[in-house]
Amino acid sequence: MNDFSRQDHWDKVYTTRGENQVSWFQETPAPSLELIGHVGAIRSSAIIDIGGGASRLVDCLVGQGYEDVTVLDLSAAALASAQSRLGDKANRVKWIAADVTAWEPTRVYDLWHDRAAVHFLTESADKAAYVSRLKAAVKPGGSVIIGTFAPDGPERCSGLIVSRYDAASLAATLGCGFELIDTRRHEHTTPSGVTQRFQFSTFRRGPDR
């Protein structure tokens, strides 16, 4: 799927379905918030949420006083939904409408968070581009939290084939330079009552060589 069709697909999803009509909806993103706390993020930490879309993680981060939050998503429609929900608080957030595989970071971050974005990348070139951006955007010693469908999770989502991971296969995809420091499973219940099995893995970015 090329960049244009990928964007078209996600814009259609976010303009034709309500916020709580998508399978990944969470009223409160508890696993992500817990892991962000575990890596020692402080209020001044630079945090980027990759594929954040209309997720409520940004609401929680702003509400908890985090001062340097960025949300990146391919779909401008998804970002507009989050901005509308936040109202004036949206001005406290930096918003980037871009495909992460083509994005060129202009700064570095203390924490990279991705819940259910990278698993939509199934081509090796897209995965390599993702890792390249990850390496460019996370400072040495920074943290990376990635949640994906587990090996026994769904094979498709929103009509698209996904890549499923466990901690070992995700670590292999990221390659050297990222130390696995935590992994856990999570069962997400969709708005329609279906259970989806996820894995969340946390990595620390090693020093530049």
Where are the predicted features?
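A conserved beta-strand element that flanks and buttresses the S-adenosyl-L-methionine
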Residues: 113
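Class I (Rossmann-like) S-adenosyl-L-methionine-dependent methyltransferase catalytic domain
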Residues: 1-107, 121-133, 137, 143-209
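Short catalytic micro-motifs in class I SAM-dependent methyltransferases
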Residues: 116-120
